[in-house]
């Protein structure tokens, strides 16, 4: 059976369930496992992957082999690769330089992104992508870094006045 939109279990619980065999398959961003495996957060860092072609090449590159080995050591089999360009949706002006983040509350998407936003003077909030819309709508966050798919799927354009798009 297929359970869409975290209806079987919460997003952040899926990695542990995959490891334990309680969940058979998940279309799961590797950065969601970054709390346990910090090395996986490299996939969400800005300017590390600059094109879809480069992202796909990681599968057979040394970095891809290492990521696959790390996941397999945790009991998770990586079946396919997908890289998505992303950006920052904001309720106010676009965030294009570090000073633009100062004083804002931002969903960074990974520990490392949170560290960068905090260094720029922002407060951060940790949540899966499917919680961004309501958090922006209620004012719990001012902006969110996320994938292009999430920007579109969760209709963040309805709440955003600014968008900072990444390359790719």
For the regions a protein language model found, what residue spans apply to each?
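Short beta-strand-centered segments that line the small-molecule binding cleft or hinge
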Residues: 57
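N-terminal secretory/targeting leader peptides
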Residues: 1-54, 62-168
């Amino acid at each position: 059976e297929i359970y869409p939109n975290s209806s079987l279990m919460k997003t952040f619980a899926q990695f542990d369930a995959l490891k334990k065999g309680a969940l058979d398959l998940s279309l799961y961003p590797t950065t969601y496992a970054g709390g346990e495996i910090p090395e996986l957060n490299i996939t969400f860092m800005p300017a590390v992957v600059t094109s879809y072609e480069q992202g796909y090449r990681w599968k057979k590159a040394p970095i891809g082999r290492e990521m696959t080995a790390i996941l397999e050591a945790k009991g998770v089999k990586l079946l396919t690769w997908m890289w998505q360009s992303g950006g920052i949706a904001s309720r106010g002006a676009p965030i294009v330089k570090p000073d633009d983040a100062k004083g804002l509350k931002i969903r960074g998407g990974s520990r490392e992104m949170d560290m960068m936003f905090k260094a720029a003077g922002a407060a951060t909030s940790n949540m899966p992508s499917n919680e961004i819309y309501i958090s922006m709508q209620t004012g719990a966050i001012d902006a969110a870094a996320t994938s292009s798919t999430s920007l579109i799927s969760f209709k963040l354009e309805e709440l955003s006045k600014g968008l900072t798009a990444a390359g790719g």
